[in-house]
């Protein structure tokens, strides 16, 4: 499977699971040899994307492939790839429960008894940064050094990994954890 196929496939899976919604959220991978970033296009339903739709952006930030306009959150993905040479995949989501914590500007602290705690004991919530600008990734390097998932204050969440499958799986696990913690909070 090539990079564009991989991005289209996982974007569709994440939309089917309710972690990406309609035109919200974006998925990317980087080819570390060429520096090309393959990212979902802006304002497109992820379920309908084909590999030909996936935007390809070169190391100079120029779009060299794909249909439509690259995601407005390209700068977020680019900053993560620059800061973390070990990362090859980024998922940015507005999933309901992680976003609820982000809207409260609240770190998500996983209880010691939760089995998932080994993956992320604390998901840091960054201060608000204007979406689509360089502000949105302020502090992300430190947050992602602590945990492969972090919250973007007032906005959503990001997961990173060496593979897109793993970044997607981490986001799924983080959303389920956020949901369980939210329900437990509501139960008192």
Question: What is each PLM-predicted segment?
Answer:
Residues 1-188:
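Glycine-rich flexible loops
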């Amino acid at each position: 499977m090539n990079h564009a196929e991989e991005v289209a496939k996982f974007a569709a899976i994440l939309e089917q699971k309710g972690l990406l919604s309609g035109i919200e959220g974006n998925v990317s991978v980087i080819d570390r040899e060429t520096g090309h970033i393959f990212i979902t296009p802006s304002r497109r339903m992820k379920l309908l994307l084909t590999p030909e739709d996936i935007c390809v952006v070169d190391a100079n930030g120029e779009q060299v492939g794909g249909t439509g306009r690259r995601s407005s959150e390209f700068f977020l993905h680019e900053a993560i790839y620059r800061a973390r040479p070990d990362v090859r995949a980024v998922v940015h989501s507005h999933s309901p429960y992680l976003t609820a914590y982000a809207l409260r500007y609240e770190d998500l602290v996983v209880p010691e008894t939760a089995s998932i705690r080994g993956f992320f004991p604390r998901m840091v919530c960054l201060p608000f940064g204007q979406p689509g600008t360089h502000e949105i990734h302020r502090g992300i390097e430190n947050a992602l050094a602590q945990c492969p998932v972090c919250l973007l204050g007032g906005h959503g969440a990001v997961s990173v990994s060496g593979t897109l499958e793993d970044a997607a799986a981490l986001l799924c696990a983080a959303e389920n954890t956020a949901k369980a913690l939210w329900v437990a909070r509501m139960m008192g």
